[in-house]
Amino acid sequence: KTTLSEQHMDSRGLETLLRNFSEAGVLEVEGNTLRFTSEADRAFAKGGWLERYVFRAVDDVSGTLAIRDKAANLVVVDGAGVTNELDVAFMARNRLFVIECKTARMDKEGSTKANDTLFKLAEICRRVGGLGTRGLLASYRSLGNAEKRLARVLGIELVCGVDLARLDEKLKTWVKS
């Protein structure tokens, strides 16, 4: 059970999203209260939907890009014993490709910042797959110019906001580059 604030209740985009989740049977909306039908549905609404969308896009381009192996929610323990979860990962062109998926507002007080996410993704790529590993941040929300510059410096590809609608094209360009 989750209660929405007045500010949330006044968001047309959120209203549409909640209606879609409600029609899919993921949650029920009663006034300003959300009731999830299960913990799995809550996790799906909280961001699992983006991971599933990204994995499906990877699966759709697998044949075109000669992707050999692919996984979602992959737990990896590196040589130092550090455990990391990779939202989506796949092998192509003898390289590991790692995708981090984010739906949260990374500019919100108290939330994980975009910079932290980018540094973490770059470090995971380095530790788990080595120098040839490529990283991509798929974010439901757009990033600011400073974060885009940081991603470029770190070698992290971005597919954010409205660009998610063209994820398959972005994946093809990313893997082939």
Where are these regions (language model features)?
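Intrinsically disordered, low-complexity Ser/Thr/Pro/Gly-rich regulatory segments
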Residues: 1-177
